[in-house]
Amino acid sequence: MKTIKIISRKSHLAQIQAEIVGMKILQYFPTSKIEYIKKDTQGDIDLDTPLHKMPEIGVFTNDIREELINNSADLAVHSWKDLPVEMEQGTIISATIDRADLRDLLIFKKQSITKKNISLLTSSPRRKENLSSFLLKALPSKPEEIQFMDIRGNILTRIKKLMESDADGLVMAKAAIDRIIEDESRNFLKEKEEVLNYFKDLNWMVLPLSENPAAPAQGALAIETRSDDEETIEILNKINNSEVFRSVEKERAILKKYGGGCHQKIGVSHQLLDVGEILNLKGETEDGLRLYENIFTPKESFKDDSLENVKNFYPENPENSSFFDRQNIKDSAKILKEITNAGIYVSRSNALDEIKEIDRSNIIWTSGIKTWLSLSNRGFWVNGTSDSLGEMESPPENILKKIKWYKISHDASPISDKETISTYKSVSYTHLTLPTKFVV
């Protein structure tokens, strides 16, 4: 088999992504030889102009596409979100592979956590639009004002700019940080160590798709080839993830309907789950139309129509009714207070009613947005949420390393992969044993 030439941008992240694709090809074609080619693009050279103000589209991809057309490379690996929604003739996106995390990541200086007026670095109109309201509620300091400032450069450059500036935080694609941290090659060990070292002075927050849908195709890699290169296309058919391809095409089609381009203030994410699929859409069109949809479509095998015609879920005889009261469990606050350097998964906000303190070395994750906002109102920094998808469909994580997780819930909580700390229990009563405090 011929040597397969893979071209990408020169950035640390772009080279990691090219190598991920190269390794995937070698899994199916172990005798192949891979050659990596790196190239600066217009977007890499002009680091001053905000992306949404650049006069041309495809500033990170057009120069690389030319190398394909000139037969200098066999395939190009892009961050798919960098590609224009309209592809020019001569090349096609032939494949993609498993998608990384779709979500955005906020990194925030620890020294800025209590500030009421904060500034965040991002050049994305979408992020500015959707985070300007959510972060006012989600940050424990309850800031009065958020100012956004444009920033350019690769991931390490952007983090350095944050640490050397008066800005308080930086928003970027979580997939970028994940790929850098998870990279096991020695090619970029120095850069990886620099990133991890910066995180010692930073808090982080994974931003939920229900409130901040990603850019279409975020987290996905586009593998571009010449349209007539049947040999390379046949190779890529073996590694293509058709489900991811379908999700990305759906996201890009929705953005295209509103005009397309990185200047749009629109986020759209399509997630494939074991139980169905979710479409998150939020932002504002150029005509001022506000968009906000979170649509779940279950798989047929998970639909349950048995309760569809039930009109009354209460017992016909009131004497058969049961009443429940919530009682705190003694010593649970003491147990939780002693936990450090672990993950705390909070199933609902009232599971922490009696909890005044959680060590700041811990990661806090919530079951949904409502619980997140309740905890932030009490001054807790929340790192992320399962976004009401369940702890198995959207599990908690520490982006920097593996840790032990504890689940804060009631004493009859279902079996979990986490160690459960029961902070309350439900006590049932009948109409005959109901305490006087419940009687009106």
Question: What is the role of each PLM region?
Answer:
Residues 94-123, 199-211, 359-391, 427-429:
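Ser/Thr/Gly-rich flexible loops in soluble cytosolic domains mediating phosphotransfer, phosphorylation
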Residues 5-7, 76, 94, 120-121, ...:
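Short, well-ordered beta-strand segments
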Residues 69-78, 165-170:
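Alpha-to-beta junction loops
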Residues 2-49, 53-54, 61, 128-129, ...:
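Small-molecule-sensing regulatory modules
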Residues 1-5, 113-116:
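Immediate post-signal peptide segment of exported/extracytoplasmic ligand-binding proteins
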Residues 21, 288-432, 437-440:
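Signature of uroporphyrinogen-III synthase
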Residues 80-81, 87-146, 203, 393-400:
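A conserved helix-loop-strand patch within extracytoplasmic ligand-binding domains
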